[in-house]
């Protein structure tokens, strides 16, 4: 599959690398065509890179791995025409570090980033997932022992099915994937971040995750 990963940070690079390893044709998008991180990644892993629009245009599926506070601007740069009809996997979190750590979490208007993007791009099929864990666990759930879960939120059932298949290819068993319902449920997933950040500070590692007891706990 042709997949665009928008964002050149650690999350974007981790997801793009995993997708290449699974045989996908991956393009990394950034604000400028000559982004050094994107060029380095493409040279090391065999993907391509360009602007947000360059990456999104030919893609069959788009991953938003930009920071949640700038995701709308990034997707606007990618272009509505380049997103129309496509599944957009939103893994972002709106984190404001202006007052230090832990950051403030969430958009000023109380919506989730996923809802903001869906409203801005109504012909795009937005699915929220993977934002409740560190990037290494996203693509290698076996790093965390025992039962733990990944969440899905979205208004389009077909789009969620596509994303569930992608998660399965990352190693997420079907009984570990919890569909929270429509896209309004993404608010709950994004608001897990304050708790995640506190636990990260206490544990000193990101190798942990949330699990719902009673859902596949014996798997």
Which stretches of residues belong to each language-model region?
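Active-site-lining helix/loop region of Rossmann-like oxidoreductase modules
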Residues: 137, 148-219
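Rossmann-fold NAD(P)-dependent oxidoreductase module
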Residues: 14, 18, 120, 166
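Short beta-strand and adjoining strand-loop segment in the mid-core
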Residues: 102-110, 140-158
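Short, glycine-/small-residue-rich phosphate/pyrophosphate-handling segment
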Residues: 108-132, 139-140
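Rossmann-like NAD(P)-binding element
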Residues: 44-87, 92-101
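General beta-strand structural signal in soluble alpha/beta enzymes
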Residues: 49, 125-129, 176-180
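NAD(P)+-binding Rossmann beta1-loop-alpha1 motif at the extreme N-terminus of oxidoreductases
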Residues: 1-40, 44
